[in-house]
């Protein structure tokens, strides 16, 4: 597996760079197989999903997860095609049969999930769950950890455990936590920044990511700083 992966990486490095919009991750963009920004690497191909924590970038493919750490690429097997990928607080990969975490495959039908020291928070059409316990009823698509709270997003944003809630302009399709709030992409192609006091529109986007004080949006490989400005 290691020699085959090395060959794929070398072949990708020799191939022409593919055209297309950059895929944002927390700290930069992946354009085709080329990782730019906070991490630097050549992947064997364009990933389906990408995310990162403070120390590693994860790129998900059918039946394979690549970890880029300290300039090295490691291949990890996946028992299926990934449906979602979360690197923070802990690694969680959504699959048809459950959620893969460092603790193993957990049999929850999640649309999104967070691996935390308290356990796996996950969301679906019934609500926000912690492992096998329903915490909040509702229909949610995204869940992030922000400022000591778990934020579940659907047509509304619910903050747990404080109980605060805010209506969203459209259902959330993707969300990531930044230092200044929760950046999310809504149906209709508009990005917003969510805080407990309200919403700030960020403009049109098809994908987004967040790291510390910076938001990454595509297409156009745009970056925004918390508080406004590039």
Language-model features: where?
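Surface-exposed loop/turn elements that mediate protein-protein interactions on large endomembrane-trafficking
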Residues: 32-43, 64-77, 97-109, 125-137, ...
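C-terminal motif of bacterial Sec signal peptides marking the signal peptidase cleavage site
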Residues: 12-13
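Post-signal peptide N-terminal segment of secreted/secretory-pathway proteins
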Residues: 48-51, 57-72, 86
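Blade-level signature of beta-propeller repeat domains, shared across WD40, Kelch, NHL, RCC1
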Residues: 206-230
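Repeated scaffold domains used in trafficking and secretory/extracellular systems
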Residues: 17-26, 45-54, 80-88, 108-118, ...
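Residue position within the beta-strands of beta-propeller blades
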Residues: 31, 59, 93-94, 122, ...
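Sec-dependent signal peptide recognition
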Residues: 2-7
């Amino acid at each position: 597996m290691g020699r085959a992966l090395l060959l794929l990486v070398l072949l990708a490095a020799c191939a022409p760079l593919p055209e297309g919009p950059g895929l944002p991750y927390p700290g930069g963009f992946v354009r085709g197989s080329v990782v730019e920004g906070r991490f630097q690497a050549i992947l064997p191909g364009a990933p389906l999903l990408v995310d990162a924590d403070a120390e590693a970038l994860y790129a998900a493919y059918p039946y394979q997860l690549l970890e880029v750490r300290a300039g090295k690429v490691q291949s990890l097997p996946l028992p299926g095609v990934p449906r979602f990928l979360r690197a923070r607080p802990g690694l969680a990969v959504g699959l048809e049969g459950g959620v893969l975490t460092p603790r193993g495959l957990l049999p929850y039908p999640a649309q999104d999930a967070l691996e935390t020291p308290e356990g796996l928070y996950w969301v679906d059409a019934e609500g926000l769950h912690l492992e096998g316990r329903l915490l909040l009823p509702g229909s949610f698509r995204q869940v992030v950890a922000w400022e000591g709270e778990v934020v579940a997003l659907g047509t509304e944003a619910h903050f747990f455990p404080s109980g605060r809630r805010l209506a969203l302009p459209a259902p959330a399709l993707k969300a990531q936590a930044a230092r200044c709030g929760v950046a999310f992409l809504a149906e209709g192609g508009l990005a917003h920044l969510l805080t407990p006091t309200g919403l700030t529109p960020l403009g049109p986007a098809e994908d987004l990511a967040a790291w510390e004080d910076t938001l990454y949006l595509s297409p156009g490989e745009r970056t925004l700083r918390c508080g406004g400005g590039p």
